[in-house]
Amino acid sequence: MGLWGGRFINESNKLFKEFNRSLSFDYILAEEDVISSVAWSKILMKSKIITEKEQITIESALFELLKEIKENNQKILKSKCEDIHSWIEEKLIQKIGILGKKLHTGRSRNDQITTDLKLWCRKKIHLLLENIIELQKTFILSAESNHNIIMPGYTHLQRAQPITFSYWCLAYVEMFRRDFSRLKDVLKRLNVSPLGSAALSGTAWKINREELALSMGFDSATNNALDTVSDRDYVVELLSSASISMMHLSRFSEDIIFFNSGEADFIELSDTITSGSSLMPQKKNPDALELIRAKCGRVHGSLISILVILKSLPLSYNKDMQEDKEGLFDSIKTWNDCLCMAILVLKNMQIKNESCRKAAEEGYSNATEIADYLVKKGIAFREAHNISGQLVLRAISEKKSLNELKLSVFQMYSNLIKNDIYKNITLESCLEKRMSKGGVAPSQVYEEIIKAKKRLNIF
């Protein structure tokens, strides 16, 4: 059934009809369309546009339809309807006859679709927030159970300074904490109701939009109908949040892929989250992580797409905005899938203590400690930095670690260096001295774990 056509003489071209249809993807909004339609029927009754008996009949039929949708929403795709709105209306009319044609009074598909989309986004945001919390919890528990593992920290993918695996975990807790905060902000701005804005200038019927908004769980109604039906900022914001979080997931994946490689050998991934090679029997591939890394680009592409779609669009609604959904639907599913997979990976990997420590010991990651030691002896940092660099060069030439150099060698570069140099350049000393807020000192890390557990209600 078409929702328009009275002013047309000729029927739409078959190819155009197919090109114009959105049911193949907006069928996902079926439940939301029913929910908003029920709310609309109630406000029509309160405005005395339909009777109480008519409203009860409409609501009953819509909930009956909702039950059918939940049982199998794929059957919607067999229809030739233009979109989900026309499909719902067609089914409603089939159930209750001409009364079903009253439901669209005072409503436009322009405010209807953005209401449905906001309801869908809100539902998905709550699910995403839960999984972001779960991912943070998994990092915290991993940090707590591997608190004593020392490993190299990297800059430019070269060993820089010693850190702990717990500290590495906490870095990602901070990233996903920001993701959580961003997503909550999206929800705050998204949660205003468009319904009742009609096509672009509001409705001529006496509708209490604030009451309507509250009935659907919105905080309030929007303030300007022209802006309301034009607005897809919430889609941009949601995809922006998704893109940033996916970037964090991609960085996490790259770290683990490297840690799992034969070159690092810091961790062992479980058989349950890896795959093999059809040719090379020795291979154990981190496919889950590689897919997360790749899917990041897919989500970023959807963000760019919606920005380009909305660029230069005149007010108010334009058919271009039909293209806001496929990328959004795909990206939100992708983001959620990747969050779940990251949780699974973290729960199914073993940290190799000895390999991590060996790498930290071999990379001259304690060189900064020599410079700091000399500064405490009264040497300017730039000069101390130079002396430390010369000692690293000497150690490399002798194929030794800094700890293995003789005191006499140290004193060739500065007579201020005494026997206490050795206790100052142990890995443990490197960690313990970094007591500044956010530092790697075990006591600081432990304190942050306790704070995070309290914040996330981990008992």
UniProtKB/Swiss-Prot annotation:
Any one GO BP annotation for this protein: L-arginine biosynthetic process
Keywords in alphabetical order: Amino-acid biosynthesis, Arginine biosynthesis, Cytoplasm, Lyase
Residues of the signal peptide: none
GO cellular component: cytosol
Pfam families (alphabetical): ASL_C2, Lyase_1
Catalysed reaction, written as an equation: 2-(N(omega)-L-arginino)succinate = fumarate + L-arginine
Record-linked InterPro entries: Arg_succ_lyase_C (IPR029419), Argininosuccinate_lyase (IPR009049), Fumarase/histidase_N (IPR024083), Fumarate_lyase_CS (IPR020557), Fumarate_lyase_fam (IPR000362), Fumarate_lyase_N (IPR022761), L-Aspartase-like (IPR008948)
Pathway(s) the chain acts in: Amino-acid biosynthesis; L-arginine biosynthesis; L-arginine from L-ornithine and carbamoyl phosphate: step 3/3
Keyword DNA repair in record: no
Keyword Amino-acid biosynthesis: yes
GO molecular function: argininosuccinate lyase activity
Documented EC number(s): 4.3.2.1
Subcellular localization(s) per the UniProt record: Cytoplasm
Family per similarity comment: Belongs to the lyase 1 family. Argininosuccinate lyase subfamily.
Protein name: Argininosuccinate lyase
